[in-house]
Amino acid sequence: MSVLGALEPARVMHYFEEICGIPHGSGNTKKISDYCVSFAKEHHLTYLQDEYNNVIIWKDGINGYENSAPVMLQGHLDMVCEKEEGCDIDFETDGLCLQVEDGIVTAEKTTLGGDDGIAVAYALALLETDEYPHPPLEIVLTVDEEIGMLGATALDTSPLRAKTMLNLDSEDEGHLLVSCAGGVTAQVELPLSFETGDGEKYVISVSGLMGGHSGVEIDKGRANACQIMGRVLYELHKEIPFSLCFLNGGLKDNAIPRQAEAVIVCPEKRQSEINTKIAVISSEIKHEFLETDPMILVEAKKTTLVEKELAMTKDSADKVITALLCLPGGIQKMSFQMKGLVQTSLNLGIMKTEKDHVSLSFSVRSSVESEKRALLDKMACLTKTLGGTVTTNGDYPAWEYLENSPLRDLMCRIFEEQYGRKPIVEALHAGVECGIFAGKIPELDCVSFGPDMKDIHTPKESMDVESVKRTWEYLLEILKQLK
């Protein structure tokens, strides 16, 4: 039974619900890609599906727009897969459980994937009918945007003719995005040596954090569970000796981690001291993040007594804790040109203990290329002193602001006519695929926009139905005037 069937715009909501029924997390996009190809075949549209699962669908201009300049509509097929503790959905095989309440669409206990499923839904609803006048369309649906914009980076853009691009990967109605930061993923690896640890085993956990997008929401000042764990372990070790067995935290380098866990082995009969110290640390941290992460919790739970437990050597553990405590995180510099815009930042998104090393995955962002390089150099220098290495991947360029943008001017005018107010024209401290396409297609005029969505990349993600409808009408009018 359809959950969204009674909502308008009906065909947009129809396709969004179908998309939500198909597993399409980053790295798992074959099924959603094939779905788009099947759609193109069914509607007798020219298409291209590459080896990465990117899909391009072409449609001729209609209703007098046959000879107009082509327009690209672009979004991504993959979603961030996050779920609440206790949720048994398998993102590899299961669809989402949609809910609607008071005009707000959510998914039960998981991310919704409105980012960027709504772009795909808009595109398919436009492609299936000749009801709406539009120029020739090039629908470009990329994969793995959420893990480094890998699809857009790999895409061969030579078949594309459009010099005007509408990106549908924004989450604030009335905001027109015209520039963004560049970024890169930095992988810190610290080698480990192990020995046998004796005593009682404890699980230290940091949980209850808000999390969020590591670019868009880095300015919120929210706590990072992995870095909090480094602080907890350092504070605990001041008073109570322990051996560190392993630590893990976070799921995506572009999401602020909401939880982290470490296992330690302590001398026997120290449980009371450990609980007291952890309670003090938890209280202090909770007070510091009362406004941003009111539910933050640090706990220590004793597990089965283990006579011999494999643990890191003291030297290895000290270096790991030092890295967590001293590697930079969060906002590094604000822009002087655009008030309120973060210029340079980084986020430790994934912390994982491997067989012979600890890996720390950072998302590094800046709208100034030299600052991005300087921040990477700082990380490399500190990591080198700890005996580790830093490698980078997924480097993508900043999307520079165009002084002369006919598309931006047109969209501002149409917005004022439709809404009775001026749109907010802004830059974003996050990577969007516009930067990749602008780097590949000379003289590309591009604007990103979309309906209202909140708490993306978290299980609280939501999408406003009325905003989806207004944005659909806005999109149709833009295409109508791009003759």
Kindly label every feature range from the protein language model.
Residues 17-21, 263, 297-310, 347-351, ...:
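A short beta-alpha structural unit
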